[in-house]
């Protein structure tokens, strides 16, 4: 019988060398993300978002990345959800992309800021109608008595707003402004490659790269 202790993979697809990576972590992330897309991975834009609540307890969940540029990594959610309350109490977060088919991880840590009203409005308007209605119908993370209650709210919102529901005031974007980004490539015998970009205003282009022991 197979036990958990027997479950393992010996990674061997690729290596990660300092000479081969971009000096800027956003450029390196773009390179890896394009390779994930080219490999046709299922939802390569999924990431784990870790937060810490007012009581000091961590929590994590899967969310979708919706924008990346030199300012940071953007996702959208309900500001009154558990993650929203966590980020109001402690405006720092960690992200993790895990692309098992490529034997890669990207870890990101940084402070949180809300996106502008215009950014949130533009993205909300681009969502499918059902998702826009759902943003009104769901009081995310709140206890409800039944699925029927949620569906009744959905119907009421659809009847109220029709084809053009506005963005709810409690719904919008966050940007993780990173001060550290780690790229991890699986290697044989668990001797993985780990390159850490750390923000450094004195360095060009504003980041230093360090190799970490696996």
Swiss-Prot record:
Q: Which cofactor does it need?
A: FMN
Q: What is this protein called?
A: Pyridoxine/pyridoxamine 5'-phosphate oxidase
Q: Subunit structure, briefly?
A: Homodimer.
GO annotation terms (biological process): pyridoxine biosynthetic process
Name the Enzyme Commission number(s) assigned to this protein: 1.4.3.5
Q: Which HAMAP family match?
A: PdxH
Cofactor binding note from Swiss-Prot or TrEMBL: Binds 1 FMN per subunit.
Q: What SUPFAM superfamilies does its record include?
A: FMN-binding split barrel
Q: Which Pfam families match?
A: PNP_phzG_C, PNPOx_N
Annotated InterPro entries? Pyridox_Oxase, Pyridox_Oxase_CS, Pyridox_Oxase_N, Pyridoxamine_oxidase_dimer_C, Split_barrel_FMN-bd
Q: What is catalysed by this protein? A: pyridoxamine 5'-phosphate + O2 + H2O = pyridoxal 5'-phosphate + H2O2 + NH4(+); pyridoxine 5'-phosphate + O2 = pyridoxal 5'-phosphate + H2O2
| Species per Swiss-Prot/TrEMBL record | Burkholderia ambifaria (strain MC40-6)
Superkingdom to which the source organism belongs: Bacteria
What positions does the entry give for FMN binding? 61-66, 76-77, 82-83, 105, 140-141, 184, 194
């Amino acid at each position: 019988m197979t036990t958990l202790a027997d479950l393992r993979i010996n990674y061997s697809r690729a290596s990660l060398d300092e000479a081969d990576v971009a000096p800027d972590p956003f450029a390196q992330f773009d390179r890896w993300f394009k390779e994930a897309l080219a490999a046709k991975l299922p939802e390569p834009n999924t990431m784990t978002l870790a937060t810490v609540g007012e009581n000091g307890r961590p929590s994590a969940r899967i969310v979708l990345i919706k924008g990346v540029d030199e300012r940071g990594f953007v996702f959208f959610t309900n500001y009154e959800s558990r993650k929203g309350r966590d980020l109001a109490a402690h405006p720092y977060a960690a992200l993790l992309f895990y692309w098992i088919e490529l034997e890669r991880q990207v870890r990101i840590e940084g402070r949180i800021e809300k996106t502008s009203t215009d950014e949130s409005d533009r993205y909300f308007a681009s969502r499918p109608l059902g998702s826009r209605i759902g943003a009104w119908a769901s009081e995310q993370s709140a206890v409800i008595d039944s699925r029927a209650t949620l569906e009744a709210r959905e119907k009421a919102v659809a009847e109220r707003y029709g084809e053009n529901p506005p963005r709810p005031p409690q719904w919008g974007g966050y940007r993780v402004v990173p001060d550290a980004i780690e790229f991890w490539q699986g290697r044989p015998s668990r001797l993985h490659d780990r390159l850490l970009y750390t923000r450094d205003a004195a360095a060009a282009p504003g980041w230093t790269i360090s190799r970490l022991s696996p």
